[in-house]
């Protein structure tokens, strides 16, 4: 593989330390790097920059991305030297900082927004106080849910307990039946890999109607005031349960870990998912870019 190294468990501490120096892009978080490892993921480092070869969430093939600052150009040049018969290098999910460091480089053929992969960022205070215009209508829907189902409750559940894992998998499978989802296997396998990761710091909140588990969210607090909202499913016979889950989770993450922002991941170009995430009223998005590089103009 030349310059590339397989991402192994012992690499995750180093990769997480590097990612912590940058904005919290979900695809470069160690949970994503490990859980969505459909085949092997790869990386190499030059100076302050790491270049990755990762599995695409939806397409299933490998793509190249990076995270870095001043050493982005030499890292790309090193990447190009490892490739044969390549006139153009295409990078996906390039973070804003890296894009700014190369956008005036003569080797750049094109730069465009990677719209299917922008991260949705939410202000936690607005989520739990319903203070934005979009959020105010959500409060009414949640009240209706709780009035109709007064025995709904939530609790933090232990992901190392096999009984809890079985309940989570059952909710996911029920969601497949309710939605008719076809492309669910990658997410399901990623869910199972993430849950089994040792020392992952994942927080799972289970939602119950009396004793019956009807939903869950799986999240991870980060040191920069964010938390990553990785996985979540709900029984769709409970109208607005997913909204309630986000509200309860945001409140818990703020009270317990002091989180100020939630990263609700990209929409992967799925229209229904895009509509849902926009309906929640994101405060901003962490933008990502597709960058094409002319190898002949590298210097």
Where are these regions (language model features)?
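Short, aromatic/basic amphipathic alpha-helical patches
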Residues: 99-110, 276-277
């Amino acid at each position: 593989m030349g310059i590339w190294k397989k991402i192994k468990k012992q690499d995750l501490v180093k990769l997480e330390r590097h990612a912590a120096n940058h904005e919290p892009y979900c695809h470069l978080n160690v949970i994503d790097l490990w859980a969505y490892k459909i085949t092997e993921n790869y990386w190499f480092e030059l100076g302050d920059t790491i270049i990755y070869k990762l599995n695409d969430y939806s397409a299933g093939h490998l793509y190249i991305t990076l995270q870095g600052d001043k050493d982005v150009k030499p890292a790309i040049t090193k990447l190009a030297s490892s490739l044969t018969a390549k006139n153009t290098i295409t990078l996906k999910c390039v973070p804003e900082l890296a894009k700014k460091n190369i956008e005036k480089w003569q080797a750049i053929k094109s730069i465009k927004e990677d719209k299917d992969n922008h991260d949705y960022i939410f202000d936690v205070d607005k989520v739990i106080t319903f203070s934005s215009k979009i959020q105010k209508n959500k409060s009414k829907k949640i009240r209706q849910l709780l009035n109709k189902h007064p025995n709904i409750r939530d609790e933090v559940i232990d992901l190392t307990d096999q009984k809890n894992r079985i309940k989570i998998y059952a909710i996911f499978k029920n969601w497949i039946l309710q939605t008719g989802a076809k492309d669910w296997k990658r997410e399901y396998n990623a869910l199972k890999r993430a849950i089994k990761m040792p020392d992952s710091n994942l927080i799972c909140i289970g939602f119950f109607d009396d004793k019956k588990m009807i939903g869950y969210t799986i999240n991870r607090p980060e040191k920069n005031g964010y938390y990553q909202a990785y996985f979540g499913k709900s029984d769709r016979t409970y109208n607005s349960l997913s909204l309630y889950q986000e509200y309860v989770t945001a409140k818990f993450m703020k009270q317990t870990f002091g989180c100020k922002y939630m990263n609700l991941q990209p929409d992967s170009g799925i229209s229904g998912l895009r509509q849902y995430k926009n309906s929640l009223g994101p405060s901003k998005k962490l933008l990502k870019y597709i960058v094409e590089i002319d190898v002949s103009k590298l210097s």
